[in-house]
């Protein structure tokens, strides 16, 4: 009887551990759920301005910033609705939001940019939650949480303004921080729309 009980616990644990799921939530204030959709199809020369807004207790912010920049560059590589060639492109992390939008619009208008994409990374991290009831359970996940705001330089119109959260995990998962980069990359691809055909 004890063997059957132990076997059942092992099988149950394996079944629960295999229950990994992905969720993605988009909170839109303006525009459509994808960058390259409908009225946003001809964005011209684009500049991407990444920044961070980490928690006060964020671990290894420099490492996460480096991971984020790599994944932003990878995700925007085949952007189908605009050009990232000079003078546009993906800039280094800075505090872009500390400047008034009118100042950014003027600055990048003078540089020949058509569209500004402000991309603020707020979370790029693994989570681990425990319950101390019987049986003891833990749930692990990786999360990417960011805000994206896209502006037309000529008109100042807000083309897109949304918050995106994507996480993957489940019961009995232990996931390293490095896996969070895949969440950011996948979320960026999801909101980008169709990719450029080579």
Model regions and ranges:
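Bacterial N-terminal signal peptides
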Residues: 7-17
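Stable alpha-helical elements in mature extracytoplasmic
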Residues: 64, 68, 72, 100-104, ...
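Amphipathic, coiled-coil-like alpha-helical scaffolding segments used for oligomerization/assembly
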Residues: 89-99
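Solvent-exposed loop/turn segments at secondary-structure junctions
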Residues: 53-56, 93, 122-127, 166-169
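A structural "domain/chain start" motif
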Residues: 17-90, 163, 193-198
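Short secondary-structure boundary motifs at beta->alpha junctions and helix caps
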Residues: 136-198
